[in-house]
């Protein structure tokens, strides 16, 4: 049986390259994208296009776009419809803090963890959770830091039977885009 992974796939550069890395390392991947009312839907479109391309070219990636549209209007962020304009330019801490979506990666992680644990239990195997978070996000997004990932994983293990069958892969956690 192939190694199993559940990937948070935004459709951006980071998570897309993690997907390719997983496939190159012989993983069976379940990719999840989240539609939470973000203004830049182009990444979700790119995620679907990438999955379609890969599946037409010899890979088999299970893909699910999960809608969290009910959160629109409840979350305060410039990234979400109804918020102010999205800041442009380089990742500068002052202007990029407006792009923080409260608890976004925790919301995503809870869903991804549940899917990974379900796969582990049904297939009686270990499952890796893969994310494209990287060091360039640490100053801006607290939920992209190792300390957050560790605490979140510990809570997951405390709250679920067989959680030791699920591990994290974050290949870019200490790397930067530049």
Tell what function each PLM region has.
Residues 1-178:
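ATP-dependent adenylation/nucleotidyltransferase module used to activate substrates
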